[in-house]
Amino acid sequence: MSQASRALKAYRNALRATSVAFKNDVATLDAARNEIRTHMKSQEDPKGTNRSIDERLKLLDEVTVFLRHNIVQGRKVDEGKYRLNIHKDTELGDNDDIKKKKDGLSNGGFTGCCGGSGAKTT
């Protein structure tokens, strides 16, 4: 596949991913698409790292995967309640890694974020 056709495919996939991730949020959808469009039109690497075109396309593919799998929209329905737009591509973890690490959160009598208030325990 030529580099131009790979770039077009990556660009289209990124735009589709924004449609899924930011459905019904016109402002965020437009901002995300403008950002992608700006970077695609740019001849230079925006961070100045001199990445090759292949590396930039790989990065765009990774952004696309991240948008599809890790971004979930939430809409407030009641005070303190939100409805999440979980779709078929949303990555749903089982939290096994988090459960395993929870035992190691206490450190020297202090408990951190998920383990409590952060106050010293005796």
Swiss-Prot record:
InterPro entries: Complex1_LYR_LYRM7, MZM1/LYRM7. GO terms for cellular component: mitochondrial matrix. GO terms for biological process: mitochondrial respiratory chain complex III assembly. Its main location: mitochondrion. It is found in: Mitochondrion matrix. Belongs to the complex I LYR family. MZM1 subfamily. Assembly factor required for Rieske Fe-S protein RIP1 incorporation into the cytochrome b-c1 (CIII) complex. Functions as a chaperone, binding to this subunit within the mitochondrial matrix and stabilizing it prior to its translocation and insertion into the late CIII dimeric intermediate within the mitochondrial inner membrane. Modulates the mitochondrial matrix zinc pool. This is Mitochondrial zinc maintenance protein 1, mitochondrial. It comes from Komagataella phaffii (strain GS115 / ATCC 20864) (Yeast). The gene is MZM1.
